């Protein structure tokens, strides 16, 4: 979700950095309709996807109760698990990009804590479904699964 000029510029630069031969699908909050006949897919990124779902599902960003947090997390996981299942059924390849947010201090504001917690649990669940998992630190991929 593009919310300001800086984000619009960031997205534009990101699009320009992609090789011309890449076919790009910008899915927003609906992932599985993006699957076509290509054999290789890159979802970049789960963190942005979670943000999009949170903004779509939540009216009051000042406080997100535990029930709504669960609904957000369940929807994100359901969509990602469906995508992974469809990719596996077609014997395609899927690379997922996410951010590891749990290596820092606990955020001081409610929204950041909720987001970090949902992100962490989704990362764990997706890693469990994945054949391989890499943590990229300082541009160096480290295989952790």
Where are the language model's segments positioned?
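Ser/Thr-centric signal marking residues that sit
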Residues: 18, 24, 47-48, 98
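A basic- and aromatic-enriched beta-loop-alpha substructure that forms the phosphate/nucleotide-
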Residues: 29, 39-61
């Amino acid at each position: 979700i593009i919310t300001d000029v800086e984000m619009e510029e960031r997205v534009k630069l990101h699009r320009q950095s992609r090789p011309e031969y890449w076919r790009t699908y910008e899915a927003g909050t609906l992932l599985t309709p993006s699957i076509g006949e290509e054999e290789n897919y890159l979802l970049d990124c789960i963190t942005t996807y979670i943000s999009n779902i949170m903004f779509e599902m939540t009216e009051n960003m000042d406080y997100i109760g535990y029930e709504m947090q669960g609904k957000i997390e369940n929807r994100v996981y359901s969509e990602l698990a469906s995508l992974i299942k469809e990719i596996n059924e077609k014997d395609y390849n899927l690379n997922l990009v996410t951010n590891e947010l749990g290596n820092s201090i606990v955020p001081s504001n409610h929204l950041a804590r909720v987001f970090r917690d949902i992100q962490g649990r989704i990362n764990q669940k997706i890693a469990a479904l994945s054949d391989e998992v890499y943590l990229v630190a300082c541009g160096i991929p480290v295989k952790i699964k």
